[in-house]
């Protein structure tokens, strides 16, 4: 289902009887908007929920995710930091899902020296441990001479506002469908983690976002922080001729009817894949073999 909402890297929070959508905005837009819906079909623009005035960043506001926690709403996101000009991960807090969100601190949550970090995803395990998954962005992350986006993981504290210890590598582009398009620039980005029947399912996107081959795969682990094994069924969400171009950077949520849903973006113009994208929602679930699927048809 095409929601008609322009944006990329979408995240949908269900809170009570309403759904709240957050997404990446164009580079020059200084903040994030929130869209609200009762039925996932009709969406109302609720205005800006976070702007550069409440953030460490000043542009390139990307991939916001919001969790409800201890009566507050906590947003993890990335933005461009003045001075270093690197993309950093921030954390902001609000009293309502529509904001206004304000940074918990005057500096980013995560700043890796000389590296841009993006696509923050907070995963709270049922044993009480919290994790932040994120992507080391390929313009500043060079591995064996290749610009490489890799998925990382680091522990979060009990308030979800500080990191604990060191980050570790979770996934890197190493499969044929992830690397055949471009040998000099490669991606594993946009991480999201689900837990099902005691196992951890990591979804991620590979290939260039402005390419029709941008697609979603998944990997499975026995522990939240891995090691993860990529599925042979990948990609599970990919280009469909004459229908859908560049589906990717997904997230999951449970709808009011109890069904698992997947939010993702596609290129707004099938015939002209580029940065302009629109948000879609599809059914998702697990098959008889325990493999994750997204039913986009």
Descriptions of predicted regions:
Residues 1-297:
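Carbohydrate-active catalytic/glycan-binding domains of CAZyme proteins
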